[in-house]
Curated annotation (Swiss-Prot):
ATP binds at residues 100, 129, 157-159, 170-177, 385-387. The modification Phosphothreonine is found at residues 1280, 1390, 1562. This is DNA topoisomerase 2-beta. The gene is TOP2B. The modification Phosphoserine is found at residues 1224, 1324, 1328, 1330, 1332, 1346, 1363, 1387, 1400, 1411, 1428, 1439, 1441, 1448, 1453, 1460, 1509, 1511, 1513, 1537, 1539, 1563, 1568, 1600. The lineage of its organism: Eukaryota, Metazoa, Chordata, Craniata, Vertebrata. Residues 1493-1499 are annotated as: Interaction with PLSCR1. It comes from Cricetulus longicaudatus (Long-tailed dwarf hamster). The record marks 865 as: Important for DNA bending. Coiled coil: none annotated.
Length: 1612
C-alpha cells in the first residue's frame, strides 16, 4: 500500500516534471523569438573599475582615434601645428601622470627635475621627478601603504580639502588611477627620506592584479617614478605611433616652459627651454607678419602667478595656456580674463586711428591676437575630467593679473593694431565695391533727377560728358543749354549742395552718402581700379565730368570737393583730363547793344577803373546760375569754347595742392597758405594793386595748382571770414549785417524776427539761407546764462532759456525784437562816419567792421571753426573791461581778467595760461540731501538732468544707482535740483568730491584766440590783454579821428548858424535888401559881404574827396537849388529861411543856437580823445545800470501776491511758492576741489609769475561767507585778523530780508565783504570770483562817483545839420540835452548786480563814492588807482569797498535796482540816513563822511512798528537808499563750505569805521509783503538770538512793485 502510494507519488511527480519541462521548452522558444532579457540582466551594477573600462570616455575622453590640428613637437621641424591622429584617452592618461609630477613642485619648492622617457618599441612610458616623495607609511584607516592607496585604489587623493587653497592640477582623485586602469602594467616607485623607506609595487591587467609591495630601507634623496605600459588594445592601437609620441613630446616641452625652476629631461636629453618666454619662442620662431617682419612678442610677468606673452595672430584668435601646468587647449575663464583686458586697450587705440573707418568690435580685435598664458589658480575647476577648459570665475582665482601700461603700449606697437587697421581697410573696400558695378550698363535705374546722356554706357561712352550742377535751378539752366548742343553726348545730374570730403570722411559716411554713390553709379567708377590706360577708361559710362556751379566762393568749394573726390580715389583720372568746368558771367555790363561779360569781380573792378562815364553802363550782378535766363543759357552753351575750362594735370605740384587743401594732416600748412594769401592781399591793397583773378578772356584751361591757390583759397578765406569774428567789433559778417540793418531801420517799435530777417537780406545783400539769418538774430537777443553778457537786441518773446541752451526758442514768426538801448551807446552813431562801408551788387551794405567803445568780442565771447583756424573766446565782464579801459586811458596797465558769464553763480578759477576751472554750486542740506543750485557754464538744465541725474537714479550696466530720488525746482533762469541719497552714499560721494561725482566741474581752455585784426588778417592772440591792448590802440586812434570829424562838422554847423544869424540881423537892421532883386544879384551880394557858401555841404564834400571813397558815383548831388552850379556857391541855407525867421522869437532862438554851437565847438576842442572815450563809457555804464535794473524787475514781475487787509489793517501778502525755487539757507556749501592736475597747473602758473605780488592766487572757490577783508594790495583773498565780521557779534537771521539771500558770491581781493555797497554785479558770483582772482596789488576802484555821474549826464549831444530843414530843429537839440541831463540825474543808480555782496569788514581808504564828497576825502592818486582797478568789481557782484560809507549803505543786496529811491522808515537814526542815488546824482554830494555813524545797537528797535507800518513813512525821506550800512549782498549770504557756522557771515557787522548797522529797508510794493520770500530766508518764527547778535529780526514792508527784486540773487 505504502509502496503503491509511493509509486503513485513518483508518477505524479514525473508527470509534473514532464509538464514543467514542456512548459519551459515552450517558454524558451518564446523568449528566443522575442529575445526578452530578465530584469537582472537588464538592470546591472558594475564596480567602478568595470565602469571605467566599460565607459572610458566619461573619465579619460574618447578611446577612438581622432584626427585634428594640434601643436606637436617633431624632431625635424620643432614645434608646429599640424594634423595628427591620436587617441584622446591615451594622451590623457599620460598627461595625468605628467601633471602629478609637476604638482609636486608646488608641494616641494626644492624639486628641480622631471625625466620623461618614452619607448615606442617596447610600449613603456616612464615619468620620474625628484622632490618630496610619497610618504612610505601605512594608512591607519585604510590599513595600506599610502603609495598603494593613492595609485591602486579609486577615489583617493590629497586634494579633497577645498578649504585649503592649492595651485595644483590634481583635483578629483582619478588621474593616476586611470592611468593604472588603462595599463597592462603599472609600476610605482617612490622613496621618502622622512620615513627612511622606499616603496615599489606593480599592478597588472588594468589594475586587477597586484604584486606584493617591496619596502626597503632608504636614506637617499626623495624621488617618485611611475612606469606604465598602456593597454594599447583598449585604445585600438598596436603601438605608440609617431603622432602620439610627438604630442607627448610637446607636453614635455610644455612642462619645461610652465614649471618654473624645473629642468625637464626627455629620453635622457635636457630640453632647451629656459622659462616661459623661451618656451613661447618655440611657437613664433621664424614666423613673419604680413609685411615680412618677424613677429614681435610682448612679455610681462605680472606677478609670481601670472606670466603673459602676446603677439600677432594671422589665423584668428589663438591661445596657448596653462593652469597649474595643465594645458587648457580650449582656453577658459583665465584666458578671457587676460584677453578682455588686452582687447579693451587695443580697441581704444584702434578707434583713435580708425575714426573714419568701419566700426570695430571686440571680437574682431580678438581675432588678431595670439596670447600665451601660464598661471597658477587656486582650486581650479574644469568642465570635464579632460581639463581642457577652465571654468572657475575670475573672482576665485586667488590672484589678479594687472597688466601694466607699458605692456599695453608695447602691445599696440607690436603689429596687432596695424593688422587690425589693414583688415578694416580691406573690409571697407569690400563693402564699397558692393556699391560699384563691374558691368557697364547703357541704362541705369533708381537715380532720381538724372538726365542720362543717350550714348552713355554705349560704344561712344568716352565721348559723353556728365554735367554736375549745383542744385535743381542750375540743372534747368543746363537742360536749357542742351537744346543747343544736343542730349546724345551730355547728361545732367544735380548735386544737393556740397559733397562729402571723402579724404577725411568715415567709412560709414561714404557708404551712406547718396551723392557719392550716385556719381559712382552714373559714371561707372569702381573703387581700387586704376584707370591708367585706354582699355580701363572704356569701362566708364562717361568719359568726362563737367562741373557747373555758381561763380561764387561756395561754388568754388564744390568744384574743389569734386576734384578731391576723384583725386583721392582715382588720381590717374586727373591725368586723362577727366574733369572740366563750365563758367558763367558774374557781372554783365551793357550799353545800348553792347554787352560785356566778366567772370570775376577783380576783372570787373579793373574795367571800371579805366572806363569813362560809368553811369552810362547798366550793371547786372549774377549771384548764381539761377539768375541767368534760358535765353542766356543757350548763349553760354552756344559759345562752349569760351565757357568750358579744362583742368590740366601739370605734375606732382597739383597733387600737393589738392592734398594741402583737403587733407587733415595739412592743417599747419593750410594756416601758412592762408596767412601768405592774406598778407599778399593786404600788400596789394596797400599799394593799390588789383586782386588776382583766373578767368580772363583768353583762359581756356587751368591747372589744379592754379585752381587751388587762386580760386579755392578765396573760399577758404571767406570761410574764415564767415566763421571767425573780427577783433574790432566781435562780429561775424552775418551778425554785422543784422546790426547794420537795425541801425538803418532805427525801429522805435518792436519787429518780428522773421520780418527783420527779410529786411536784413534786402538791405545788406545777405546771400545765404534765411533760417540761418533768423537764428543769428535770435542769438544776438539771447540773454540767459551762458549766452550773451550784453544782448544788442531785445528778446521780446521766447528766445530760448538755459533749460535747453536756447534751442527752446519760439518760431521766428512769433517773436519780436528791436535794438537794445545799449546798442547805440556801444556803437555811437557818430562813429559811422569814420567807417569803411562795403558794396555788394553795387549796393552800399555794412561796414568792414564797426568800432564799439569796448571790445565786444570779449564781452560776449566768440566761437567758430574755419579753414585752418578755429576761434574760441569766453565771455568777460563788461564793467571789468570798462575799468581796464579807464586804467589804460590813465596810462596804467590793465588788470588780468577771468572769464565771466552774466548771472552765473558758480566759480571760475584760473588753472594755468588760458586754462580755467568752471564749477557749479552744490550744498549739503542734511544727511541724505544735497541741493544743486548752479551748473557749469553751458551745461543746460535739461541735458544735465537726462545725462547725469537720470543715470544716477536708475543706474547703468556698469554703475549702480547712486541717488534715490531728485526733485526739480528750477525756473527758466535758475537751477535747483534737490537730490536724495542714502547717508552712506552721500558720505562716500562727499569724500570723492561732490562736484566730481555730480559732474559739476568742467574745464575751459582758451588756446585758440584767433581773430581778424583791423587789417583783415587772421591773428592768434596769446592773452586777453593782448586783445584788449590792440583794441585800445585802434579805438583811441578812432576817437582822434572822431574828434577831427566833429570839430570839422560842428565848425561848419557853427559857421552856418553864424552866417544865418548875421544875415537875419543885417536884414532887420536894413543893411541887406533882398526884395525885388534877381537871384544872381543876391548871390553876388552875399559873396561880396563875406557870406560863405553852405559850410556844411562844403565840409562834407571835402571829406569825401579826402577819403577818396570809391563810392563817389553812388553819392547823389545834394544841390537841389538853382542858386548856382554844383561847383558854385550855395546859399540855399540862407535864402531858404522862412519869413518866421525874422520874428523876434526866432531871432533870439537863432542867436542862442549860434552861441550854443560855438560853445560846443570850443568845448570839443578842449577835450582830448580820452575825454570823449570816458564820456562814452560813463553814458554806457549809466544805461547798463538801467537796463539791468529793468531786467531784474521783469524777472520779479508777477511774483508778488495781492495784499489782503488783516484785522488790524495790516496788509498781508498772499505767500507765494518762491521758496521752492530758491536755495535752502541751511545748506552747507561745498567748495569745489582742485584736482592734483589742476593744482599742478596753478603752481606752474604762480611759479611762472616769479612770486609777483600782483599775481592772483588761484582759488577753487570764493567763500560766500568770507567776511574777512582781503589784504589790500596783495591780490589774495585772505582773512585778516582785523576782520571784525568773523569775530563780532552775529546778527540774527533777519526774517524776510529780501535781497540778502546770496548765492555763492565770492569777494574780490582788496574789497571788504561786509559793506552793502551799490552792488554792481549783474553778472553773478563768478564774476566776483573772477575779479578777485584778477586783483593786483591795488584794489580796483570803479569811478562811479557823482563826478562820473555828472560826466554821464553832461555828455554832449552833438547835432548836425544834414539838411536844410534841420535849422528849425536846432533848438530842440538843446532841449533834448536838458532833458537828457535831467534824465540822467533823476534816474537812480540801480544795482544790476543780482548777486549778494559779501559783508564788508570795513571801507577801503578810497571807498568808492558816487558823490564828490567822498572823492574829495580820498587822496587823488589813491582814488584814481583804486577807481580804475575796481571798476569791474563795482559792477560785478563783489561788494564795493571803494564806495563811501554812506553810499555803501545805499543799496540792498538784491533790491538795488530800485530800492535806492526809498529810505528806510524804521530802525534808523537820522544820522543813519543815506543819500539816495538820485540825490547823489543831482546834487553831486552826499552827506559828509564825517557824519556820525550810528553804532550797532544791542537790539534793533521798532521792529514791530516797522513791519506793521502802513504809513507812507517809507517815502518820508526823499529817495534815500534803503540799504542799511553793512547790509551788503552778503548780509544773508549762504554759508560757504561750512567753514563758519551760519551766523558767521555777519551782514550787519561793520568794521571799525562803521559802528552801527542799520536795518535793511527794502522797497517793495505794498502788495508784496515779505512773505513772498521763501521761509528759508525768512524763517517764520523769529530766529532765536544768537551769541553776539544784538538785534532783533527786522521785518520789512514792501512799498512798491518796482522794488520787487526782493532777493535778486535767487533769480540769478
Amino acid at each position: 500500500m505504502a509502496k503503491s502510494s509511493l509509486a503513485g507519488a513518483d508518477g505524479a511527480l514525473t508527470w509534473v516534471n514532464n509538464a514543467a519541462k514542456k512548459e519551459e521548452l515552450e517558454t524558451s522558444n518564446k523568449n528566443d523569438s522575442s529575445k526578452k532579457l530578465s530584469v537582472e540582466r537588464v538592470y546591472q551594477k558594475k564596480t567602478q573599475l568595470e565602469h571605467i573600462l566599460l565607459r572610458p570616455d566619461t573619465y579619460i575622453g574618447s578611446v577612438e582615434p581622432l584626427t585634428q590640428l594640434m601643436w606637436v613637437y617633431d624632431e625635424d621641424v620643432g614645434m608646429n601645428c599640424r594634423e595628427v591622429t591620436f587617441v584622446p584617452g591615451l594622451y590623457k592618461i599620460f598627461d595625468e601622470i605628467l601633471v602629478n609630477a609637476a604638482d609636486n613642485k608646488q608641494r616641494d619648492k626644492n624639486m628641480t627635475c622631471i625625466k620623461v622617457s618614452i619607448d615606442p618599441e617596447s610600449n613603456i612610458i616612464s615619468i620620474w621627478n625628484n622632490g618630496k616623495g610619497i610618504p612610505v607609511v601605512e594608512h591607519k584607516v585604510e590599513k595600506v601603504y599610502v603609495p598603494a592607496l593613492i595609485f591602486g585604489q579609486l577615489l583617493t587623493s590629497s586634494n579633497y580639502d577645498d578649504d585649503e587653497k592649492k595651485v595644483t592640477g590634481g583635483r578629483n582623485g582619478y588621474g593616476a588611477k586611470l592611468c593604472n586602469i588603462f595599463s597592462t602594467k603599472f609600476t610605482v616607485e617612490t622613496a621618502c627620506k622622512e620615513y627612511k623607506h622606499s616603496f615599489k609595487q606593480t599592478w597588472m591587467n588594468n589594475m586587477m592584479k597586484t604584486s606584493e609591495a617591496k619596502i626597503k630601507h632608504f636614506d637617499g634623496e626623495d624621488y617618485t617614478c611611475i612606469t606604465f605600459q598602456p593597454d594599447l588594445a583598449k585604445f585600438k592601437m598596436e603601438k605608440l605611433d609617431k603622432d602620439i609620441v610627438a604630442l607627448m613630446t610637446r607636453r614635455a616641452y610644455d612642462l619645461a616652459g610652465s614649471c618654473k625652476g624645473v629642468k625637464v629631461m626627455f629620453n635622457g636629453k635636457k630640453l632647451p627651454v629656459n622659462g616661459f618666454r623661451s618656451y613661447v619662442d618655440l611657437y613664433v620662431k621664424d614666423k613673419l607678419d604680413e609685411t615680412g617682419v618677424a613677429l614681435k612678442v610682448i612679455h610681462e610677468l605680472a606677478n609670481e602667478r601670472w606670466d603673459v606673452c602676446l603677439t600677432l595672430s594671422e589665423k584668428g584668435f589663438q591661445q596657448i595656456s596653462f593652469v597649474n601646468s595643465i594645458a587648457t587647449t580650449k582656453g577658459g575663464r583665465h584666458v578671457d580674463y587676460v584677453v578682455d583686458q588686452v582687447v579693451g586697450k587695443l580697441i581704444e587705440v584702434v578707434k583713435k586711428k580708425n575714426k573714419a573707418g568701419v566700426s570695430v568690435k571686440p571680437f574682431q580685435v580678438k581675432n588678431h591676437i595670439w596670447v600665451f598664458i601660464n598661471c597658477l589658480i587656486e582650486n581650479p575647476t574644469f568642465d570635464s575630467q579632460t581639463k581642457e577648459n577652465m571654468t572657475l570665475q575670475p573672482k576665485s582665482f586667488g590672484s589678479k593679473c594687472q597688466l601694466s601700461e607699458k605692456f599695453f603700449k608695447a602691445a599696440s606697437n607690436c603689429g596687432i593694431v596695424e593688422s587690425i587697421l589693414n583688415w578694416v581697410k580691406f573690409k571697407a573696400q569690400t563693402q564699397l565695391n558692393k556699391k560699384c558695378s563691374s558691368v557697364k550698363y547703357s541704362k541705369i535705374k533708381g537715380i532720381p533727377k538724372l538726365d542720362d546722356a543717350n550714348d552713355a554706357g554705349g560704344k561712344h561712352s568716352l565721348e559723353c560728358t556728365l554735367i554736375l550742377t549745383e542744385g535743381d535751378s542750375a540743372k534747368s539752366l543746363a537742360v536749357s543749354g542742351l537744346g543747343v548742343i544736343g542730349r546724345d553726348r551730355y547728361g545732367v545730374f544735380p548735386l544737393r549742395g556740397k559733397i562729402l570730403n571723402v579724404r577725411e570722411a568715415s567709412h560709414k559716411q561714404i557708404m551712406e552718402n547718396a551723392e557719392i554713390n550716385n556719381i559712382i553709379k552714373i559714371v561707372g567708377l569702381q573703387y581700387k581700379k586704376s584707370y591708367d590706360d585706354a582699355e580701363s577708361l572704356k569701362t566708364l559710362r562717361y568719359g568726362k565730368i563737367m562741373i557747373m556751379t555758381d561763380q561764387d566762393q561756395d561754388g568754388s568749394h564744390i568744384k574743389g570737393l569734386l576734384i578731391n573726390f576723384i583725386h583721392h580715389n582715382w588720381p590717374s583720372l586727373l591725368k586723362h583730363g577727366f574733369l572740366e568746368e563750365f563758367i558763367t558771367p558774374i557781372v554783365k555790363a551793357s550799353k545800348n547793344k553792347q554787352e560785356l561779360s566778366f567772370y570775376s569781380i577783380p576783372e570787373f573792378d579793373e574795367w571800371k577803373k579805366h572806363i569813362e562815364n560809368q553811369k552810362a553802363w547798366k550793371i547786372k550782378y549774377y549771384k548764381g546760375l539761377g539768375t541767368s535766363t534760358a535765353k542766356e543759357a543757350k548763349e553760354y552753351f552756344a559759345d562752349m569754347e569760351r565757357h568750358r575750362i579744362l583742368f590740366r594735370y601739370a605734375g606732382p605740384e597739383d597733387d600737393a595742392a589738392i592734398t594741402l587743401a583737403f587733407s587733415k594732416k595739412k592743417i599747419d600748412d593750410r594756416k601758412e597758405w592762408l596767412t601768405n594769401f592774406m598778407e599778399d592781399r593786404r600788400q596789394r591793397r596797400l599799394h593799390g594793386l588789383p586782386e588776382q583773378f583766373l578767368y580772363g578772356t583768353a583762359t581756356k584751361h587751368l591747372t589744379y595748382n592754379d585752381f587751388i591757390n587762386k580760386e579755392l583759397i578765396l573760399f577758404s578765406n571767406s570761410d574764415n571770414e564767415r566763421s571767425i569774428p573780427s577783433l574790432v567789433d566781435g562780429f561775424k559778417p552775418g551778425q554785422r549785417k543784422v546790426l547794420f540793418t537795425c541801425f538803418k531801420r532805427n525801429d522805435k517799435r518792436e519787429v518780428k524776427v522773421a520780418q527783420l530777417a527779410g529786411s536784413v537780406a534786402e538791405m545788406s545783400a545777405y546771400h545765404h539761407g534765411e533760417q540761418a539769418l533768423m537764428m543769428t538774430i535770435v542769438n544776438l537777443a539771447q540773454n540767459f546764462v551762458g549766452s550773451n553778457n550784453i544782448n544788442l537786441l531785445q528778446p521780446i518773446g521766447q528766445f530760448g532759456t538755459r533749460l535747453h541752451g536756447g534751442k527752446d526758442a519760439a518760431s521766428p514768426r512769433y517773436i519780436f525784437t528791436m535794438l537794445s538801448s545799449l546798442a547805440r551807446l556801444l556803437f555811437p552813431a557818430v562813429d559811422d562816419n569814420l567807417l569803411k562801408f562795403l558794396y555788394d551788387d553795387n549796393q552800399r551794405v555794412e561796414p568792414e567792421w564797426y568800432i564799439p567803445i569796448i571790445p565786444m568780442v570779449l564781452i560776449n565771447g566768440a566761437e567758430g571753426i574755419g579753414t585752418g583756424w578755429a576761434c574760441k573766446l569766453p565771455n568777460y565782464d563788461a564793467r571789468e573791461i570798462v575799468n581796464n579801459v579807464r586804467r589804460m586811458l590813465d596810462g596804467l596797465d590793465p588788470h588780468p581778467m577771468l572769464p565771466n558769464y552774466k548771472n552765473f553763480k558758480g566759480t571760475i578759477q584760473e588753472l594755468g595760461q588760458n586754462q580755467y576751472a568752471v564749477s557749479g554750486e552744490i550744498f549739503v542740506v542734511d544727511r541724505n540731501t544735497v541741493e544743486i543750485t548752479e551748473l557749469p557754464v553751458r551745461t543746460w538744465t535739461q541735458v544735465y538732468k537726462e545725462q547725469v541725474l537720470e543715470p544716477m537714479l536708475n543706474g547703468t550696466d556698469k554703475t549702480p544707482a547712486l541717488i534715490s530720488d531728485y526733485k526739480e525746482y528750477h525756473t527758466d533762469t535758475t537751477v535747483k535740483f534737490v537730490v536724495k541719497m542714502t547717508e552712506e552714499k552721500l558720505a562716500q560721494a562727499e569724500a570723492a568730491g561732490l562736484h566730481k561725482v555730480f559732474k559739476l566741474q568742467t574745464t575751459l581752455t582758451c588756446n585758440s584766440m584767433v581773430l581778424f585784426d583791423h587789417m583783415g588778417c587772421l591773428k592768434k592772440y596769446e592773452t586777453v590783454q593782448d586783445i584788449l591792448k590792440e583794441f585800445f590802440d585802434l579805438r583811441l586812434s578812432y576817437y582822434g579821428l572822431r574828434k577831427e570829424w566833429l570839430v570839422g562838422m560842428l565848425g561848419a554847423e557853427s559857421t552856418k548858424l553864424n552866417n544865418q544869424a548875421r544875415f537875419i540881423l543885417e536884414k532887420i537892421q536894413g543893411k541887406i535888401t533882398i526884395e525885388n532883386r534877381s537871384k544872381k544879384d543876391l548871390i553876388q551880394m552875399l559873396v561880396q559881404r563875406g557870406y560863405e557858401s553852405d559850410p556844411v555841404r562844403a565840409w562834407k564834400e571835402a571829406q569825401e574827396k579826402a577819403a577818396e571813397e570809391e563810392d563817389t558815383q553812388n553819392q547823389h548831388d545834394d544841390s537841389s537849388s538853382d542858386s548856382g552850379t554844383p561847383s558854385g556857391p550855395d546859399f540855399n541855407y540862407i535864402l531858404n529861411m522862412s519869413l518866421w525867421s525874422l520874428t523876434k522869437e526866432k531871432v533870439e532862438e537863432l542867436i542862442k543856437q549860434r552861441d550854443t554851437k560855438g560853445r560846443e565847438v570850443n568845448d570839443l576842442k578842449r577835450k582830448s580823445p580820452s575825454d570823449l572815450w570816458k564820456e562814452d563809457l560813463a553814458a554806457f555804464v549809466e544805461e547798463l545800470d538801467k537796463v539791468e535794473a529793468q531786467e531784474r524787475e521783469d524777472i520779479l514781475a508777477g511774483m508778488s501776491g495781492k495784499a489782503i487787509k488783516g484785522k488790524v489793517g495790516k496788509p498781508k501778502v498772499k505767500k507765494l511758492q518762491l521758496e521752492e525755487t530758491m536755495p535752502s539757507p541751511y545748506g552747507r556749501r561745498i567748495v569745489p576741489e582742485i584736482t592734483a592736475m589742476k593744482a599742478d597747473a596753478s603752481r606752474k602758473l604762480l611759479k611762472k609769475k616769479k612770486g609777483d605780488p600782483d599775481t592772483p592766487v588761484v582759488k577753487v572757490e570764493f567763500d560766500e561767507e568770507f567776511s574777512g577783508t582781503p589784504v589790500e594790495g596783495t591780490g589774495e583773498e585772505t582773512l585778516t585778523p582785523s576782520a571784525p565780521v568773523n569775530k563780532g557779534p552775529k546778527p540774527k537771521r533777519e526774517k524776510k530780508e529780501p535781497g540778502t539771500r546770496v548765492r555763492k558770491t565770492p569777494t574780490s581781493a582788496g574789497k571788504p565783504n561786509a559793506k552793502k555797497v551799490k552792488k554792481r554785479n549783474p553778472w553773478s558770483d563768478d564774476e566776483s570770483k573772477s575779479e578777485s582772482d584778477l586783483e593786483e596789488t591795488e584794489p580796483v576802484v570803479i569811478p562811479r562817483d557823482s563826478l562820473l555821474r555828472r560826466a554821464a549826464a553832461e555828455r554832449p549831444k552833438y547835432t548836425f545839420d544834414f539838411s536844410e530843414e534841420e535849422e528849425e530843429d536846432a533848438d530842440d537839440d538843446d532841449d533834448n540835452n536838458d532833458l537828457e541831463e535831467l534824465k540822467v540825474k533823476a534816474s537812480p543808480i540801480t544795482n544790476d548786480g543780482e548777486d549778494e555782496f559779501v559783508p564788508s569788514d570795513g571801507l577801503d581808504k578810497d571807498e568808492y563814492a558816487f558823490s564828490p564828497g567822498k572823492s574829495k576825502a580820498t587822496p587823488e592818486k589813491s582814488s584814481h588807482d583804486k577807481k580804475s582797478q575796481d571798476f569791474g568789481n563795482l559792477f560785478s557782484f563783489p561788494s564795493y569797498s571803494q564806495k563811501s560809507e554812506d553810499d555803501s549803505a545805499k543799496f540792498d543786496s538784491n533790491e538795488e535796482d530800485t530800492a535806492s529811491v526809498f529810505t528806510p522808515s524804521f530802525g534808523l537814526k537820522q544820522t543813519d540816513k543815506v543819500p539816495s542815488k538820485t540825490v547823489a546824482a543831482k546834487k553831486g554830494k552826499p552827506p559828509s563822511d564825517t557824519a556820525p555813524k550810528a553804532k550797532r545797537a544791542p537790539k534793533q528797535k521798532k521792529v514791530v512798528e516797522t513791519v506793521n507800518s502802513d504809513s507812507d513813512s517809507e517815502f518820508g525821506i526823499p529817495k534815500k537808499t534803503t540799504t542799511p550800512k553793512g547790509k551788503g549782498r552778503g548780509a544773508k549770504k549762504r554759508k560757504a563750505s561750512g567753514s563758519e557756522n551760519e551766523g558767521d557771515y555777519n551782514p550787519g557787522r561793520k568794521p571799525s569805521k562803521t559802528a552801527s548797522k542799520k536795518p535793511k529797508k527794502t522797497s517793495f510794493d505794498q502788495d508784496s509783503d515779505v512773505d513772498i520770500f521763501p521761509s528759508d530766508f525768512t524763517s517764520e518764527p523769529p530766529a532765536l538770538p544768537r551769541t553776539g547778535r544784538a538785534r532783533k529780526e527786522v521785518k520789512y514792508f514792501a512799498e512798491s512793485d518796482e522794488e520787487e527784486d526782493v532777493d535778486f540773487a535767487m533769480f540769478n
